[in-house]
Design a protein with these regions (language model features):
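Positively charged n-region of N-terminal signal peptides that target proteins for export
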Residues: 1-9
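Hydrophobic core
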Residues: 9, 13-17
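Sec-dependent signal peptide cleavage junction
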Residues: 17-28
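Disulfide-bonded cysteine-rich modules in secreted/extracellular proteins
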Residues: 27-36, 310
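Glycine-rich repeat segments that build the extracellular carbohydrate-interaction surface of secreted
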Residues: 39-53, 64-69
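Surface-exposed loop/turn motifs in large extracellular/passenger domains
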Residues: 57-65, 82-96, 105-122, 129-146, ...
């Protein structure tokens, strides 16, 4: 009887171990720059097994899932990650770049990135530069440089800031943010030329500039937005009245808190960008001054709650 029980237990242990062994054999765990480069070039799921210093490229037509595994990937002389294909980032850990004029992630034209985990950091340029399509649902972005935005979605208008990539006719860069923590920068999120921005959730904070600066088409339906500098507004909207810079901002929800315990301005505009544009507000909670002095237009407000009821014209 004891022998039968022993055999049964042994078989049970084998059955339990098989999935674990299969997972271990199938997982591509990399711990060196060369191994990481080879793995992302091939495609599939790749897991960091150590901190790695390397600049990698996801080739066009290649699908890569990068599990940071609690480790840090630091760039080495170029963008830390250049995505030309399809990239999904999961797990805890960091993607960092400290090189001048380089991003932690550069997502180029027609590339797709799904950022579901990890923290992206930079301190000399944009942390994320997007010319393709990015969806963020769980990743965080920290910008330590007040001279650059944390995220730039779209074209700036010069080769250096656009990674020498010209704008294809009829093309839009799209950034969708559903969740995550975003902080710092000249602007935390800048929706640039030909950019389409959709924010439905997340926490956005800045001690230097606006949490969001929109130049083209942006919609905010949720999230928390807060600034601490009395010299800046929570949200800024600019327009040059062109196809690239329409300056169309729509807010249907979210919580917006200005500086100085809610005594600062909620709305501002991009420098030089006062040629047309529109701000439409139908929902959200706004704590701060709704004065739009200097704006080229009056915000259209049909809903929402405001601490400054006097200036929130409905």
């Amino acid at each position: 009887m004891k022998k039968i029980i022993s055999i049964a237990l042994a078989l049970l242990m084998v059955a339990v171990m098989l999935p674990v062994m299969a997972m271990a054999e199938g997982a591509n765990v990399v711990s060196t720059p060369d191994a990481l480069t080879a793995a992302v070039t091939k495609g599939g799921e790749v897991t960091l097994g150590d901190n790695i210093t390397a600049s990698i490229t996801i080739p066009a037509g290649t699908n890569v899932t990068l599990n940071l595994g609690g480790f840090t990937l630091t760039g080495n002389g170029n963008h830390t990650i250049t995505n030309e294909g399809t990239l999904t980032v999961i797990g805890s850990g960091k993607v960092v770049n400290t090189d001048g004029g380089k991003a932690a992630l550069f997502n180029t034209v027609n590339a797709v990135a799904n950022l579901n985990g990890g923290t992206f950091e930079g301190n000399t340029w944009y942390v994320i530069k997007n010319l393709g399509t990015i969806t963020m649902n769980g990743a965080s972005v920290t910008q330590n440089d007040t001279g650059s935005s944390a995220i730039d979605n779209g074209w700036y208008g010069n080769p250096g800031n656009d990674c020498n990539v010209n704008h294809p006719d009829g093309y839009t860069a799209k950034l969708t943010i559903a969740n995550g923590n975003f902080s710092g920068g000249m602007n935390t999120v800048k929706n640039d030329d030909y950019g389409v921005l959709e924010i439905s959730g997340g926490t956005f904070s800045n001690t230097n500039g606006p949490t969001v600066l929109n130049w083209n088409v942006a919609t905010i339906s949720g999230g928390e937005f807060k600034v601490n500098s009395t010299a800046t507004s929570v949200i800024a909207n600019g327009s040059f009245n062109t196809e690239a810079d329409k300056g169309q901002l729509t807010i249907t929800g979210g919580q917006f808190t200005s500086s100085d315990n809610g005594n600062g301005n909620l709305l501002g505009y991009g420098v030089g960008g006062k040629d047309g544009g529109s701000v439409t507000i139908s929902g959200g909670k706004f704590t701060g001054k709704m004065v739009a002095e200097g704006y080229p237009y009056e915000p259209v407000i049909s809903g929402g709650t405001f601490s400054d009821q006097e200036n929130a014209k409905k």
